[in-house]
Amino acid sequence: MEKTYIGLDPGIEGFVTAMFPNGNYEFYSIDENDDLALNRILKSIKERSWQVTAVLEDVHALFSASAKSTFNFGEIKGILKGLLVANEIPYTLVQPKDWQREIWINQDMIVSYKTVIRGDKEIKQKVVDTKSTSINSARRLFPQIDLRKNERCKKIDDNKVDSLLMAEYARRKNL
């Protein structure tokens, strides 16, 4: 049996990606749909598919994030979990580093180095630009997919990219 995989990138500008067994993809912006619309979207995906499974990014508070943005992340994640449960769609919470480790390859990596002081030594620390690296991965894996939020946008939407790559992670892991 072939499954439909859903990748959910929570956040105010998050995205939902549905990857169907026939090779079709659907993308929905969280900020352009209210909770009821997202519920209808998930219900519609489930009604059109024999088997559906979802991956929801397991986001946590970031060190530099404000309390308000952390609360908003948690609220949206909770709403998405509730909608998945209400629609009886099984889901897996996945840490960003886990799906990134599965999807990224060395050629995708955008790396810089910053100097940090440890004790009395200066050392160079490797810093991966996660957004650019994910964009490179999506371009490599899905060259036919428009990664912009919509046709009017000029820039690639990293939230859409992440939700697409999470759906691919679910497919690879056969979750």
Where is each model-derived feature located?
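Phosphate- and other anionic-substrate recognition elements at nucleic-acid/protein interfaces
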Residues: 1-175
